[in-house]
Amino acid sequence: MDVKIGVLALQGDVAEHITAFQQVLDTIPSVVGSVVEVREAAQIPSLDAIAIPGGESTTISRLIEKNRMHEVLTGFQGGIFATCAGMVLMAKSVEDPRICPLGLIDMEVDRNAFGRQRESFEADIPVQGLDAPFHAVFIRAPVVRSVGAEATVLATIDQGIVAVLQGKHMALSFHPELAGDLRLHRLFLTGLGIV
C-alpha cells in the first residue's frame, strides 16, 4: 500500500512530525510511505493524512487563509493529526476572534490556557488506546472546555481535556513529536487503517 502523509509547513515542529511519521511508516512492511512538507493548497487533496503542528495559532490561521488552504482543509477526505495550535484550529469554537477555525472537531477550545512560556510543563498522562501513560510536553498549551456528542475524549488532566478524537481526526493540546514516543502517531495511523 502506498501512503502519503503531509505536514503543514507554515510554522511549528515540522521536521519533528516528519521524522515521527516516517519512523512509524518504516515499521510497517506492507506500506511504502512518504512524508512531505505541505506549503500549497494544491498538495493537500493527494494526501492520505496531514498533520497541523503547533506554533502560534493566530499566525497559522492567518497563513492558512493567505495560502487559500482553509476550504481545502475543511473538505479534506483524509485524517488530520493536530497538535497544540493545530488543536485550536480544528475546533468549532475558539474564544479568539483572530482565529478562523476549521470546525472539524466539535469542541470548544481555550487557546493558551496555560498562558506564558514559564507555565509550560511535562506530565505522564493516561491516554485512551495506549497501554501505558504518555509523557506529554505542554508548551503554552490549549485546553478543551467542552466536546460535542461526535467527539471522543482520549485524555484529560486537572485543567481540562487535552486529547480528542472525532472520525478520522485527532487533536492533542501537547507535543507528542517532542516526547520521543511514537505511540500517538501510530494510534492516529491505526485509526485510518494504515497500520
Swiss-Prot record:
Ordered alphabetically, the record's keywords are: Glutamine amidotransferase, Hydrolase, Lyase, Pyridoxal phosphate
Q: Which InterPro entries match?
A: Class_I_gatase-like, PdxT/SNO, PdxT/SNO_CS
Active-site residues?
84, 175, 177
One molecular function GO term is: glutaminase activity
BP terms from Gene Ontology: glutamine catabolic process; pyridoxal phosphate biosynthetic process; pyridoxine metabolic process
What are the EC numbers? Answer: 4.3.3.6, 3.5.1.2
Q: Which GO terms describe its cellular component?
A: cytosol; glutaminase complex
UniProt pathway annotation: Cofactor biosynthesis; pyridoxal 5'-phosphate biosynthesis
Task: Summarize where L-glutamine binds, as residue positions.
Answer: 55-57, 111, 139-140
Catalytic activity as recorded in UniProt: aldehydo-D-ribose 5-phosphate + D-glyceraldehyde 3-phosphate + L-glutamine = pyridoxal 5'-phosphate + L-glutamate + phosphate + 3 H2O + H(+); L-glutamine + H2O = L-glutamate + NH4(+)
Sections of the chain in a coiled coil: none
Spans traversing the lipid bilayer: none
Please state which protein family the record places this protein in. Belongs to the glutaminase PdxT/SNO family.
- What is this protein for, i.e. what is its function? Catalyzes the hydrolysis of glutamine to glutamate and ammonia as part of the biosynthesis of pyridoxal 5'-phosphate. The resulting ammonia molecule is channeled to the active site of PdxS.
Q: How does it assemble?
A: In the presence of PdxS, forms a dodecamer of heterodimers. Only shows activity in the heterodimer.
**Name of the molecule in the record:** Pyridoxal 5'-phosphate synthase subunit PdxT
- Name the gene that codes for it: pdxT
